[in-house]
């Protein structure tokens, strides 16, 4: 990881030299005029203005001026949050996942590119779960040295197999190790991949230890779980269940009663694997049998999202599981949820705004357009409530008061 930091430093130098191309930052006060504004919590405002000072929103005032950015005619909303991504995954020089023969420098460039295209797609915060190489990328972006979304990382996940798995005490030690390595959240695999059948890989006792230790350290827990592992993760007190395919309605009701978040993936990740089958097949963990299983999983995912959406009080957040081939296309998951699962478009938007922020413990900082929140603001050419494909047309991106994308005309003082 030390050499990865060196390579990212090289990228930083290049970014600093080219910064006027990538970002437009106005010191002091910025006023954005909007015609249609989604506040991130389900409310729509019309014909108003957003006032920003530094990195924060300080007012919503229809009389504020002068206007710096005129976004009337567009749909303005908080920057999206992807609760489940793998920002360092990329295809290598051989075209394959993981990239046999790829140098550390090439991996660092690819990670920086993934971060950039994700930001350009309107995602101003992501949870990358996880890889140790997330850490230097997260830190470079947080310091403003590289452009990209705000990153929360799990560093190294507890896999449920191999050397990380052991007694409850050994698992607690592993969780502490991730905290020391800079983890923002803990990722736990309680099930095998759905490509290997999705069977449970941790006992209830092991899950209890992992989730309890994380809680003692002030860390949230995301648990990769299918079938019976969904209930086990919920009983263990995890923060969020990832995937959740084949969970029963009773499992989902238990999650709602416990306040456990659900992060299902309706389509993008499976569609991406199938689209890039030749680039994954034969790499570790990707077999012909696994792809046959994935071809059957989409209807199951759609069924889960439909059923989960009907469970009162169940908090469903937006996560894509974006891997190599999907970075920058994260918003396709919105289309899958609305088109294939019948999710209300505004519910889909808030799942990637205030609800995802709440799941990350950042509900008072990001995910809403209101005074006191980070100025993470995007604009779409179109209205996603009428045409969900508008999520593909992100024409303006601001993160923390810095404008990184501005395709509409700009009004300057």
Where are these regions (language model features)?
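C-terminal cap of metal-dependent C-N hydrolases
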Residues: 352-354, 358, 371-413
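Active-site core of metal-dependent hydrolases
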Residues: 189, 195-299, 317, 322-324, ...
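Metal-associated gating/positioning segment near the N- to mid-region
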Residues: 74-143, 205, 228, 233-236
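Short, acidic/polar
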Residues: 107-115, 165-178, 225-230
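Active-site gating/metal-coordination segments in enzymes
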Residues: 156-208
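Divalent metal-dependent hydrolysis catalytic cores, especially in the metallo-beta-lactamase
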Residues: 108-134, 148-159, 181-193, 220, ...
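Histidine-rich, glycine-flanked metal-binding segment
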Residues: 25-28, 37, 41-77
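His/Asp/Glu-enriched, well-ordered alpha-helical/loop segment
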Residues: 99, 216-218, 286, 297-383
């Amino acid at each position: 990881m030390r050499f990865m930091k060196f390579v990212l430093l090289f990228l930083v130098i290049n970014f600093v030299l080219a910064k006027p191309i990538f970002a437009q930052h106005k010191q002091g006060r910025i006023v954005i005029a909007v015609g249609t504004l989604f506040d991130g919590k389900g409310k729509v405002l019309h014909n108003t203005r957003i006032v920003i000072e530094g990195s924060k929103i300080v007012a919503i005032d229809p009389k504020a001026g002068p206007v710096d950015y005129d976004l009337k005619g567009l749909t303005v909303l908080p920057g999206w949050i992807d609760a489940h991504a793998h920002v360092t995954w990329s295809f290598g020089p051989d075209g394959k996942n993981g990239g046999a023969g790829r140098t550390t420098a090439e991996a660092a460039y690819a990670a920086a590119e993934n971060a950039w295209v994700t930001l350009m797609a309107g995602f101003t915060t992501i949870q990358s779960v996880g890889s140790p190489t997330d850490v230097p990328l997260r830190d470079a972006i947080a310091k403003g040295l590289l452009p990209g979304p705000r990153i929360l990382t799990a560093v190294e996940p507890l896999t449920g197999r191999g050397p990380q798995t052991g007694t409850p005490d050994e698992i607690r030690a592993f969780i502490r190790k991730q905290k020391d390595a800079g983890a923002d959240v803990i990722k736990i695999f309680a099930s095998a991949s759905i490509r290997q059948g999705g069977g449970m890989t941790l006992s209830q006792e092991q899950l209890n230890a992992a989730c309890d230790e994380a809680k003692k350290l002030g860390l949230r827990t995301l648990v990769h779980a299918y079938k019976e592992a969904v209930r086990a993760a919920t009983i263990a007190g995890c923060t969020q269940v990832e995937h959740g395919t084949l969970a029963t309605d009773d499992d989902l009701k238990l999650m709602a009663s416990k306040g456990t978040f659900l992060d299902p993936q309706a389509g993008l990740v499976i569609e991406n694997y199938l689209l890039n089958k030749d680039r994954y097949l034969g790499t570790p963990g990707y077999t012909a049998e696994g792809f046959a299983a994935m071809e059957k999983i989409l209807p199951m995912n759609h069924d889960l999202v439909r059923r989960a959406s009907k469970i009162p009080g169940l908090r469903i957040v937006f996560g894509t599981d974006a891997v190599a081939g999907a970075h920058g296309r994260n918003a396709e998951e919105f289309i899958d949820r609305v088109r294939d699962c019948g999710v209300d478009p505004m519910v889909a938007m808030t799942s990637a705004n205030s609800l995802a922020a709440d799941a990350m413990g950042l509900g008072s900082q990001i995910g809403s357009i209101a005074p006191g929140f980070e100025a993470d603001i995007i604009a779409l050419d179109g209205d996603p409530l009428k045409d969900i494909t508008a999520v593909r047309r992100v024409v303006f991106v601001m993160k923390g008061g810095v404008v990184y994308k501005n395709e509409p005309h700009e009004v300057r003082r």
